[in-house]
Amino acid sequence: MIRESFLPPFRPCIGEEEINEVIDTLKSDWITMGPKTLKFEELFRNYIGSKFAISLNSCTAGLHLSLVALNIKDKDEVITTPYTFAATGNVIVHQRAKPVFVDIDKETYNINVEEIENAITERTKAIIPVHYAGHPCEMDEILKIARDYDLYVIEDAAHALGAEYKGKKIGTIGDTTSFSFYATKNITTGEGGMVTTDNEEIAEKIKILRLHGISRDAWKRYSSEGSWYYEIIECGYKYNMTDIQASIGIHQLKKAEIMRKRREEIAKIYNEEFENLEGLITPTIKKHVKHAWHLYPLLINIDRLKINRTKFIEELKKQNIGTSVHFIPLHLHPFYRKTFGYKKGDFPNAEWVYEREISLPIYPKMTDDDVIDVVNAVKKIVSENR
């Protein structure tokens, strides 16, 4: 066995600063959405370089409210990738629109921009590019298609905090961008999300929709500055962030780039150790992007090894190395097959990657010894299965 203790696929990186800020919030008696939420939004807006940043309880909420704010509705179509988490497709369905999947590029595992135009119909209203693992999509091509066909671009950046495309931070390119602060993400608030946009009208609509459709700043009604009177001006949702979550986010954001760089260091070691090893396929990184390295997706070349991906994961677990898989393509799930008629074989590239992908541990709390343990475990399994 390579190591004695189990190395989990992820661990959140929470410091004393976050803990002390949460304690301060709890002692303040203001624990729901309030001043610290607004502070976190301001810090995030400045970090990304967007005009507006609206905090929410998840990235899913951000994607959903983006669709609502842009009036995506019944019988509309939204183009996205099948190689993503369920949230990306589900929010489209919540609007009674149809998710139209486009297969992925076999190098970056992002949506294949060369196939997008073929999927456009008179019902198409938006494109949701997903920056898989933290590698930005080809946004210039996507924006050109969107301009040519008068479509919105709603970026799913759940994996991509800190990523850049041709020198532009992800979060400053599309009509809206949604980020995730789930426990496994590059920064965390436990649960949480943020939408960025440069469009004031969209920003104001999302702010109202996130809290039941109550008129703006109604959260202040419980403070000395507020009034008991409010009006419901939209049929909104309960999607707001709390000051407890924001307290964590304030300090997570301050070290976001330090944590991204540690992820990058780990990815570099993996790449150097695995890229010339027969039986493995390492991630491709385009020269014009800065990778966020939320995931390290290693592909097992099942044509060169006597072991499949599932068995490889089991062998890693025997060596006390935890892993995950990202993702089961959406078109293979029962709901999407039954509701939209998708079937196995519809998106061969997504299926090809899925059958081979293993997400190796990559997070700031990993020590160099942890990283070497992963490397040695992978090499051991490869050598035993040639």
Curated annotation (Swiss-Prot):
Residues with the N6-(pyridoxal phosphate)lysine modification: K185
Transmembrane annotation, as ranges: none
Pfam families per UniProt: DegT_DnrJ_EryC1
Cofactor(s) for this UniProt protein: pyridoxal 5'-phosphate
Keyword Oxidoreductase listed: no
Keyword annotations of the record: Pyridoxal phosphate
Signal peptide extent: none
Biological processes, Gene Ontology terms: polysaccharide biosynthetic process
GO molecular function term, any single one: pyridoxal phosphate binding
Domain of life, per lineage: Archaea
Family named by the database record: Belongs to the DegT/DnrJ/EryC1 family.
Full protein name: Uncharacterized protein MJ1066
